[in-house]
């Protein structure tokens, strides 16, 4: 269980904080100079390491909830420790954040957790009442990139219609309208990635169910799928090295992955009724010129393409907390009984 790694992770954080000269001394947001509509980010830069006003952690496998900044409380921590919605390293984020925040007398927050769900109602119907589509994906980086683009073009995020393509260890392609992520693939669907299969033919998958245990099959589709299943590596750079020396199998699998990502972006263009202001490309794979060039061939007819390589999720966490401290957004609480 992921919870078994909690103390180890806490020790690593303590060591990193100590080496950087941070000590957990608390101070209220008001005393620190954080007031509604204030410039908290600038003040924080000069505030030093003497006092903590907030601690942010990565949101984990929680019940479906709106995007936003959430106050971490005992209810949320209990839900994450129970891991009813799956084991994931992000389940430790809020638990660790609350531990360190309490030692400093500060509040702990999560921002846009992986289960943050803003889908429109029609996106939830799967084709069978036995199975409802639910969202798990890269909300934090996806929403942060959308907001970043909005700032750069001088428009409100809520006024833009965007497709965001996140390409990391998993692939999330999402449609954004009126400041909400109204549809996307979930981590169990869509394009295959470095180690996930994405969508599979259902009847073929049913036939596999009797050939291996549920745990083994789950691993095959979520951890040992995608590039790894075909090529034995999750490393995109290794795949590109093979392509450079003429490996046709590597080239074929690479091309199929980009093809599927482009196809998913086309589906999101349909969700937005063809009215798209920009296609934003982000995540670790966006560092690859080859990936971006191939992908442009599939999506640049939709709208102008803007590339944001990498995943600046630490900044996204900080920005989410600053929106609360500045009074731009109210901190939410996870609903009970979900």
Question: At which residue positions do the language-model features occur?
Answer:
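General beta-strand structural signal in soluble alpha/beta enzymes
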Residues: 55-57, 107-113, 163-165, 183-184, ...
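Conserved phosphate-binding/catalytic loops in two-lobed NTP-binding clefts
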Residues: 289, 293-319
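Glycine-rich phosphate-binding loop plus the immediately following alpha-helix
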Residues: 92-99, 110, 117, 125, ...
């Amino acid at each position: 269980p992921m919870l078994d790694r909690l103390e180890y992770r806490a020790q690593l954080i303590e060591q990193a904080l100590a080496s950087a000269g941070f000590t957990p001394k608390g101070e209220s947001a008001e005393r620190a100079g954080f007031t509604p509509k204030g410039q908290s980010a600038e003040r924080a830069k000069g505030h030093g390491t003497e006092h903590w006003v907030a601690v942010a952690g990565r949101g984990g496998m929680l019940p479906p909830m709106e995007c936003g900044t959430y106050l971490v409380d005992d209810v949320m921590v209990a839900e994450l420790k129970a891991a009813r919605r799956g084991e994931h390293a992000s389940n430790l984020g809020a638990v660790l954040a609350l531990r360190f925040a309490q030692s400093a007398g500060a509040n702990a927050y999560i921002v846009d957790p992986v289960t943050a769900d803003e889908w429109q109602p029609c996106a939830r119907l799967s084709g069978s009442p036995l199975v409802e589509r639910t969202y798990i994906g890269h909300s934090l980086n996806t929403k942060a990139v959308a907001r970043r683009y909005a700032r750069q073009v001088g428009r409100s995020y809520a006024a833009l219609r965007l497709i965001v393509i996140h390409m990391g260890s998993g692939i999330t392609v999402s449609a954004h309208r009126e400041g909400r992520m109204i549809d996307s693939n979930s981590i169990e669907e869509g394009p295959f990635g470095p180690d996930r299969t994405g969508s599979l033919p259902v009847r073929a998958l049913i036939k596999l169910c009797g050939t291996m245990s549920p745990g083994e099959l789950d691993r095959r589709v979520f951890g040992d799928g995608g590039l790894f299943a075909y090529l034995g590596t999750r490393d995109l750079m290794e795949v590109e090295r093979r392509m450079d020396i003429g490996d046709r199998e590597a080239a074929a699998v690479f091309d199929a992955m980009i093809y599927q990502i482009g196809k998913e972006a086309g589906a999101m263009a349909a969700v937005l009724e063809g009215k798209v202001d920009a296609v934003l490309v982000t995540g670790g794979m966006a560092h690859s010129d080859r990936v971006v060039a191939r992908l442009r061939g599939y999506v640049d007819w939709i709208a102008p393409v803007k590339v944001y390589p990498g995943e600046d999720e630490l900044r996204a966490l900080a920005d989410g907390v600053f929106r609360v401290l500045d009074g731009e957004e109210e901190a939410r609480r996870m609903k009970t009984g979900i």
